[in-house]
Amino acid sequence: MLKLDLKERDSLDLRCIAGHHGLANPITISDLNRPGLVLSGFFDFVAYRRIQLFGRGEHAYLLALLEQGRYGAIEKMFTFDLPCCIFSHGITPPEKFLHLAEPSSCPILVTRLTSSELSLRLMRVLSNIFAPTIALHGVLVEVYGVGILISGDSGVGKSETALELIERGHRLVADDLVEISCVNGNSLIGRGVHKSIGHHMEIRGLGIINITQLYGVGSIRERKEIQMVVQLEEWNSSKAYDRLGTQELNTTILDVSVPLIEIPVRPGRNIPIILETAAMNERLKRMGYFSAKEFNQSVLKLMEQNAAHAPYYRPDDTY
């Protein structure tokens, strides 16, 4: 629990009332558990590695057990290595419960949030923490709201392209090394690997520059969902590049498919403008409009019309 960011702690509004020595207990599973069955004495398949969430129902049953002097289930529950217990709705557990929990060093936490809201927020936080992660070389920028991961060989111009995009009002997320996490199984969230050196760029011939200081806080983002990958490569005259845009390429990162665009680089090509156009075109696709397919259908329709009119005219017809 100590590893939570300050923002995440504030969103959960947690307050420790007992078991402070156990705040460093490891949390190894992102799921939650409602301990109703455990309190009733059923200890088969105990999900003891999960965070134990006590709502109003569990609290009412807990009070009934304590009033009847039935401490057995509670004492046995604390023989397991529980990461922590959280009481929602601002409920403060009875002193007897805190006394039974103290020897196990299980933190007892209280939050003002409802059980449903706490579950949603906890799952969001834990999903981010336990998300599979990979680090890739590239530059992550936000262009017209679209997260673009610029990749390519060293020296192809990734940082220079990103710098021009920042100059044009877009935002930098990470340069050189991007940490990518798969959240909820289908979203790729990218960020800088090291916060202390984040939002710095290395420009050959110029050195290290601080984007925040040069362009202001409006030119950066802490994290962004990756919605497109742009592969910059040296122009290869023997390679056939897509000129219509009807061929949709994809790449896979952490088992998530992402649209891929291959852009050949050579003198005279304005790569930043091409990336801006690619970002706007991607937004159109997400809105249901595919420019290349619309153009292709228009051409086919025109060809069909010409083919239908052809039998009615002869080459020597004059008007």
Curated annotation (Swiss-Prot):
Pfam families, per database record: Hpr_kinase_C, Hpr_kinase_N
GO molecular function: ATP binding; magnesium ion binding; phosphorelay sensor kinase activity; protein serine/threonine kinase activity; protein serine/threonine/tyrosine kinase activity
Cofactor: Mg(2+)
Active site: H137, K158, D176, R243
Enzyme class per UniProt: transferase
Binding positions for ATP per the UniProt entry: G152, D153, S154, G155, V156, G157, K158, S159
Region (Important for the catalytic mechanism of dephosphorylation): 264-269
Binding site for Mg(2+): S159, E202
One GO BP: regulation of carbohydrate metabolic process
Region (Important for the catalytic mechanism of both phosphorylation and dephosphorylation): 201-210
CDD domains attached to this UniProt entry: HprK_C
EC number: 2.7.11.-, 2.7.4.-
Catalytic reactions of this protein: [HPr protein]-L-serine + ATP = [HPr protein]-O-phospho-L-serine + ADP + H(+); [HPr protein]-O-phospho-L-serine + phosphate + H(+) = [HPr protein]-L-serine + diphosphate
Keywords, in A-Z order: ATP-binding, Kinase, Magnesium, Metal-binding, Multifunctional enzyme, Nucleotide-binding, Serine/threonine-protein kinase, Transferase
InterPro entries per record: HPr(Ser)_kin/Pase (IPR003755), Hpr_kin/Pase_C (IPR011104), Hpr_kin/Pase_Hpr_N (IPR011126), P-loop_NTPase (IPR027417), Ser_kin/Pase_Hpr-like_N_sf (IPR028979)
Subunit annotation: Homohexamer.
Entry remark concerning the domains of this protein: The Walker A ATP-binding motif also binds Pi and PPi.
Note: Both phosphorylation and phosphorolysis are carried out by the same active site and suggest a common mechanism for both reactions.
Protein family membership: Belongs to the HPrK/P family.
NCBIfam families (alphabetical): hpr-ser
Record's protein name: HPr kinase/phosphorylase
Organism: Treponema pallidum (strain Nichols)
